[in-house]
């Protein structure tokens, strides 16, 4: 591990210290390492350099919508090489939450997630992507 010295203006340092306290970091180094990892991951995504990833796709949908549950299940089965696990939660009488773990080429994972989120009666879809 390398030791470095950086200069940060007072306002930025105060904001960083607030974040450290709120998130419960042990020290500034841990917080800065996490921020650097997040920034590098985001840059890799934006530049298209992340070849493979793990994705967490979460979305809500109206389970009473005609054939939607069946259509979503078939989509997951048709992409069994990407969709590795799912958790289904009944939110209320009409709405369900699905959380799916996806693994594969980043472009394929994004395409799969976009397809699911675009289905009629699927709402609030979010994809979180992590590097492999």
Swiss-Prot record:
Listed InterPro entries: Acetolactate_synth/TF_NikR_C, ACT-like_dom_sf, Arc_rbn_hlx_hlx, CopG, CopG/NikR_regulator, Ni_resp_reg_NikR, Nickel_NikR_proteobac, Ribbon_hlx_hlx
Q: Which UniProt keywords apply?
A: DNA-binding, Metal-binding, Nickel, Repressor, Transcription, Transcription regulation
Task: Report if keyword Metal-binding is assigned.
Answer: yes
Residues annotated for Ni(2+) binding in this entry: 77, 88, 90, 96
Pfam family membership, one:
RHH_1
Q: Name one GO biological process term.
A: response to nickel cation
* Cofactor requirements of the protein: Ni(2+)
**Any note on cofactor binding?**
Binds 1 nickel ion per subunit.
Molecular function per GO: DNA binding; DNA-binding transcription factor activity; nickel cation binding
**UniProt key word DNA-binding:** yes
The UniProt function text for this chain reads: Transcriptional repressor of the nikABCDE operon. Is active in the presence of excessive concentrations of intracellular nickel.
- What is the protein's quaternary organization? Homotetramer.
Q: Which family does it belong to?
A: Belongs to the transcriptional regulatory CopG/NikR family.
What is this protein's name? Nickel-responsive regulator
Organism listed in the record:
Brucella suis biovar 1 (strain 1330)
């Amino acid at each position: 591990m390398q030791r470095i010295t950086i200069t940060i203006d007072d306002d930025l340092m105060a904001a960083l210290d607030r974040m450290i306290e709120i998130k419960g970091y042990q020290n500034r180094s841990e917080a800065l390492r996490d921020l650097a990892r997040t920034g590098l991951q985001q840059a890799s995504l934006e530049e298209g350099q992340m070849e493979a990833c793990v994705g967490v796709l979460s979305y809500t949908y109206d389970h009473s919508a005609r054939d939607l549950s069946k259509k979503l299940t078939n989509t997951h089965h048709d992409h069994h090489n990407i969709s590795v696990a799912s958790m289904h939660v009944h939110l209320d009488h009409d709405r369900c939450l699905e959380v799916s773990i996806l693994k594969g080429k980043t472009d394929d994972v994004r395409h799969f997630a976009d397809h699911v989120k675009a289905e009629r009666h699927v709402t609030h879809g979010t994809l979180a992507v992590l590097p492999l």
